């Protein structure tokens, strides 16, 4: 990856998250050098829960549409942004309370795309993919810690959605 050519790396996980993807991705950026790496976090491409309430799984109408399902992700926009960077166009990332918008420069040779959404994209978009997994108990513990502190979520909501 340090050959000066353009490379795109996918870092994703299975389950509801908190598997260590973001932590690993940030450390990898530091290791490879910020001056040559873009980190595109895919979490802002997850459709907000209030809009997902409008969807229902036909076979199981009583169940919620969680982020574990592709329909909960704005995949076309994420794919467009990845292709733009790969094609030499800068992008401005989606603004979220926990992740302010920033400009990513297409001049950087390495693009790391990190998040659950990546699992639902065509594998040919990436030169290398790394998949993380964590058990349910560890996932809940990490989500309670991170989502309360960073995403301003209530512990009760996290526990309820973890059971969904």
Task: Mark where each language-model region is.
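Small-molecule kinase domains that catalyze NTP-dependent phosphoryl transfer to phosphate-bearing small molecules
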Residues: 150-164
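Hydrophobic anchor at the beta1->P-loop junction of P-loop NTPases
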Residues: 11-13
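Pre-Walker A adenine-sensing motif
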Residues: 1-4
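Walker A/P-loop
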Residues: 22
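Post-Walker A helix-loop "phosphate-sensing" segment adjacent to the P-loop in P-loop NTPases
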Residues: 30-39
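Conserved nucleotide-sensing/catalytic segment adjacent to the nucleotide-binding pocket
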Residues: 38-41, 47-98, 110
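ATP-dependent NMP and nucleoside kinases share a basic, alpha-helical "lid"
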Residues: 102-150
């Amino acid at each position: 990856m340090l050959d000066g050519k353009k490379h795109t790396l996918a870092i994703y996980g299975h389950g509801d998250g908190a598997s260590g993807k973001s932590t690993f991705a940030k450390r990898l950026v530091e290791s490879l050098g910020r001056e040559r790496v873009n980190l595109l976090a895919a979490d802002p491409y997850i459709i907000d829960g209030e809009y997902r309430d409008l969807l229902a799984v036909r076979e199981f109408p009583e169940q919620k549409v969680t982020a574990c399902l592709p329909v909960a992700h704005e995949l076309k926009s994420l794919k467009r942004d990845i292709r733009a960077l790969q094609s030499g166009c800068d992008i401005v990332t989606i603004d979220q309370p926990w992740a302010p918008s920033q400009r990513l420069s297409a001049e950087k040779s390495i693009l790391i795309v990190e998040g659950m959404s990546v699992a639902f994209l065509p594998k040919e978009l990436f030169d290398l993919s790394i998949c993380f997994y964590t058990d349910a108990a560890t996932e809940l513990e990490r989500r309670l810690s991170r989502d309360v502190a960073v995403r301003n979520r209530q512990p009760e909501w996290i526990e309820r959605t973890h059971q969904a």
